[in-house]
Amino acid sequence: MAFNDDNFMLKNEAAKRLYQQIKDQPIFDYHCHLDPKEIFEDKVYDNIVDLWLGGDHYKWRLMRANGISEEEITGSASKLDKFKAFARTLQRSYGNPVYHWSVMELKNVFGVCELLTEDNAEEIYHRINAYLVEHQISPRKLIADSRVRFIGTTDHPLDDLAWHKRLAADDTFETVVAPTFRPDEAFIEHQRFADFVARLAQATGRTITDFKSFIAAMEERIAYFAENGCKASDISFTEIVFEAAEPEQLDRLMTRVLEGYQPQPLEVKQWQTAVFAELCRLYKHYGFVTQVHFGALRNNHSAIFNKLGADVGVDSLGDQTGLAINMNRLLDHLVQRDSLPKMIWYNLNPSYNIAVANTLANFQANENGIAGYLQFGAGWWFADTKLGMISQMNALAEQGLLANFVGMLTDSRSFLSYQRHDYFRRILSTYLGEWIEEGEVPEDYQALGKMAQDIAYNNAIQYFN
């Protein structure tokens, strides 16, 4: 069987027919970690390592597993040596999604059809570098060539959004680049919580002395984001919790934490519950889609974390006792307060997929006739794989309506990652095609094609607008 050809990952004739209906659809990338400054400045790349390996902790993780020295991963080794080290690793990465992403990027972006190996790495390195300059490869060109219509970045609540404003005012750039409100530092276990409160007070001109004044200041920032095109929020929780507390308890807790007190686990849960509930109330009011990423155990290799910081490839998926009961209680609490916004829940540990999809199905009722009001998000991070995607879609199809799914997102720091949308579309086509081939659904290519088109693009547009 041919590898990485036009029928890559399309396992049956039905899949090939369905893929033809979605392969050229635009991309609505509603969540990523791209830098709007880089998009605005639009500098032409002259080295593949800067574009392909810089900041890519997926690749760094594999390179460490292959015995590559840190010098050749994040250190001061030459760019050519880093490229060769990755080529050496890529040869041994069969079965890992990074292999598929990489060969797709090499072929579809740079026209490199031969497989990258240690033997041809230097020649391909120089060839791609020449291609970058000759074809003026820049962030905006990569975005335009990938037919990206919308980009949702991930932004600190105190960001002035200057680069988003400049992009919005630039009539030469058609892609919408919208900020996303990401208030990780608003939670008391965060090491920069006290600093965040001080900066929040300064940014809003408010005196923050208690929980109520803290939330009022947060609302001011949410309103500012809304004024500047924000359509969504995001948050990352290690665990989903529900632990109620009285306002007076929250006031005392906040005062103590700002004085240097280390909160206890119960207090962390109480604060997380209260702050998230208030934020959801505000998100609903301002029309933000609320994204919740959960289940990551971060920065586990303390030496590497202390040297390089966060998001460098030493994170894991976690487990949680009582996920279903906490998630149900939290969502019910939001419903009772009329504070349930549109939400996308991204579960990192696939063993909880059915529980998550089943829980979300309890709370889909809404007065606005919105299909898929609560979304079970695509396979995230370590579940952003062929099996991870299938597991997520299986759970959603069995427990809800797959046809209402808002589909793929890159969640990436790389301008090359739009190939992941094509990867997803191929897997989706095979997934739906197998239903046809196995007689599980009618052989109705108009209906299944419409379903595939909706999942690939149309549902996301409708959901975020």
Curated annotation (Swiss-Prot):
GO BP: any one term: D-glucuronate catabolic process
InterPro entries listed in its UniProt record: Metal_Hydrolase, Uronate_isomerase
Pfam families with a match to the protein in the record: UxaC
Pathway in which this enzyme or protein is active: Carbohydrate metabolism; pentose and glucuronate interconversion
Key words, A-Z: Isomerase
Keyword Isomerase applies: yes
MF terms (GO), sorted A to Z: glucuronate isomerase activity
Domain of life of the native organism: Bacteria
EC number of this enzyme: 5.3.1.12
Catalytic reactions of this protein: D-glucuronate = D-fructuronate; aldehydo-D-galacturonate = keto-D-tagaturonate
Keyword Isomerase: yes
PANTHER family, alphabetized: URONATE ISOMERASE
Protein family (similarity comment): Belongs to the metallo-dependent hydrolases superfamily. Uronate isomerase family.
Descriptive protein name: Uronate isomerase
